[in-house]
A protein has these predicted regions:
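Intrinsically disordered, low-complexity regions enriched in serine/threonine
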Residues: 2-59, 119, 134-328
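A generic structural signal for beta-strand entry/edge sites
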Residues: 4, 74, 126-128
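An N-terminal amphipathic alpha-helical segment
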Residues: 55-70
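A short, surface-exposed helix-loop junction/capping segment
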Residues: 66-91
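Short small/polar-residue motifs
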Residues: 72, 110-116, 152-154
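Amphipathic alpha-helical segments
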Residues: 90-114
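A short acidic/basic microdomain associated with nuclease active sites
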Residues: 109-135
């Protein structure tokens, strides 16, 4: 007998189905067939280099297989375990995990960070590695508070093996007081973003030659945090910002606005309802602690939450709303 595997491809705005004839696997092969990689955040703080990180994650080389016999111009990508991952154009340049993150070791020496966490997302189609820098951002204290916020600085690199994400290196910060995590709200703070083209290696090398500019990125980020912490905010100004970020009158939107307003003066988590920095923290606290993330057929709640915190779209939206209302 011959089994048929249906592969759906989008080409010229039309979905086409192709049938691959293959010999059916044995019972043993079916039993031993591997499931997609599940989301997990691995502690890699004892890793000296990228090879150590990838060894801890048990990552090998990915491979490709031509599909010209059924669809000219496409190929199949398999992960390091031989499992089918996705179908891409035959011109897609597959970057091996060791290639995709090799630059991080040089960046580690330049910036002085230590590898911290790493893991797979999107069922093994994307991989990230994050490092923690020694330097921190301290927000100026206010009033009788002896100490301001402490923000840890992270350097995070992400790539995909199916073209769904360019290789991206960006600055992220973690608020120590309450574990609010957020991507940088200024997309100009990306260290590099390189698409999966045939010249991606040369482009990445050029981007890393400018790595000394990362310290300027951190300086600009620190200066913006200081500006936010020095600008006092009235309750009515906060309400305007809240309405810009969460537009509409639905029950879901009202719930989000109410939760964020409660976070604006949540002293337990270090927000005091006084400054533009408190405003910003109200939204990141909502995103970190209050926003409901749901499980889907392919992703867990934990992965969806992790992915939302790594997305710069929400903090960028908040920062733009603050600028619109407060002109800072």
């Amino acid at each position: 007998m011959v089994s048929q595997l249906i592969i759906n491809l989008k080409h010229k705005d039309k979905k086409m189905s192709y049938f691959l004839n293959s010999t059916p696997p044995s019972i043993a092969e079916c039993i031993n067939r591997l499931s997609p990689r599940s989301f997990n955040i691995e502690d890699v703080s004892d890793s000296e280099n990228v090879n150590d990180v990838l060894t801890k994650l048990d990552v090998g080389d990915y491979s490709t297989e031509s599909l010209n016999h059924v669809c000219n111009g496409f190929k199949l990508i398999k992960d390091d375990r031989g499992e089918p991952l996705t179908i891409v154009s035959s011109t897609y340049d597959l970057l091996q995990p060791t290639e995709a993150f090799a630059f991080l070791d040089a960046l580690k020496e330049e910036l002085g960070f230590e590898y911290d966490t790493a893991g797979f997302t999107h069922q093994g189609r994307q991989l990230y590695i994050s490092g923690k820098m020694d330097m921190t951002i301290e927000v100026p204290s206010k009033g009788d508070r002896k100490k301001g916020d402490i923000l840890e600085i992270r350097v995070t690199a992400r790539t995909s093996f199916d073209g769904s994400l360019a290789t991206v290196i960006q600055i992220e910060i973690l608020r120590v007081w309450c574990d609010n995590g957020m991507a940088s709200w200024d997309k100009g703070n990306r260290i590099a973003k390189v698409k999966h083209t045939r010249n991606q290696r040369a482009i990445m090398a050029t981007a890393l030659e400018q790595a000394t500019g990362v310290r300027q990125i951190i300086h600009n980020l620190s200066a913006d945090v200081t500006d936010l912490s020095l600008r006092e905010v009235t309750p009515s100004e906060f309400d305007l910002i809240n309405e810009i970020v969460f537009k509409g009158e639905s029950k879901q939107v009202e719930t989000a606005r109410e939760a964020t307003k409660a976070q604006f003066s949540n002293e337990r988590l270090g927000a005091f309802g006084e400054t533009a920095w408190d405003v910003f923290n109200a939204f990141t606290a909502y995103q970190t602690h209050d926003r409901i993330t749901r499980e889907t057929k392919q992703t867990s709640r934990e992965e969806n939450r992790f992915r939302s915190l790594a997305d710069s779209a929400f903090p960028t939206k908040v920062r733009n709303a603050i600028t619109e209302v407060l002109a800072i």
